[in-house]
């Protein structure tokens, strides 16, 4: 899979698992993404896909690297879909 395709799949999963915040942006907790069975099967390297999506300004989250357990409560915010 190429990175752009994985980023698009990630966007779909954020929309599926997340909910709108006060600004109307879709938000999901990192722990929810990480523990979801479908995401686990889709993404061999979820953290790498998240970093690629952040670099391309599709999403935002606090920090540079998200780790399971430590960062489960960090919000992943969808900024754009295309």
Residue map of PLM features:
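Positively charged, polyanion-binding regions of nucleic-acid-associated proteins
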Residues: 2-25, 30, 48
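Eukaryotic low-complexity, proline/serine- and acidic-rich intrinsically disordered regions
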Residues: 4-7, 59-64, 75
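Charge-enriched amphipathic alpha-helical scaffolds
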Residues: 30, 34-66
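Short, cationic-aromatic polyanion-contact patches
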Residues: 64-82
């Amino acid at each position: 899979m190429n990175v752009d395709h994985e980023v698009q799949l990630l966007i779909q999963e954020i929309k599926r698992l997340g909910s709108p915040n006060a600004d109307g942006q879709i938000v999901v907790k990192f722990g929810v993404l990480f523990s979801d069975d479908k995401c686990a099967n889709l993404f061999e390297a979820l953290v790498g896909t998240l970093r690629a999506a952040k670099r391309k300004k599709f999403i935002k989250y606090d920090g540079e690297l998200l780790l399971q357990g430590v960062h489960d409560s960090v919000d992943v915010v969808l900024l754009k879909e295309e």
